[in-house]
Amino acid sequence: LGVAGVVGNGLKNNHSSYGRTQASILAADIIDRMRANRREAESIGAPYDIVLVDPSPTGTSIAEQDLNAWRTTLASTLPLGTGAISMNAATKKVTVTVQWDDSRGTGGHSIQTFVMETRL
């Protein structure tokens, strides 16, 4: 019985670790996309800015396509996965937030948040 408990805890911890790893990878992915599209990312209107509750964009600009693909990947990789991006135009500081439900890893409904900050 004790071994079963240890194995169960190990599985929960592995699932939580997997979520954090995926969040980190996906945050880095959108930052790489922004750097590849630096001219549009730094343009007036902040085309990459998106809040957690915003729907995914459906337009044809590179920024809109990047955000749509990123949000789709978040939703398919992480339970209830979503993300937000904000950029300070003056400092070029980008904050990427990834949020998901880690209830499998924590044993109850638990929204986890991963934040990555960098400069373009």
Regions found by a protein language model. Give the residues of each.
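Alpha-helical hydrophobic helix detector
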Residues: L1-G5
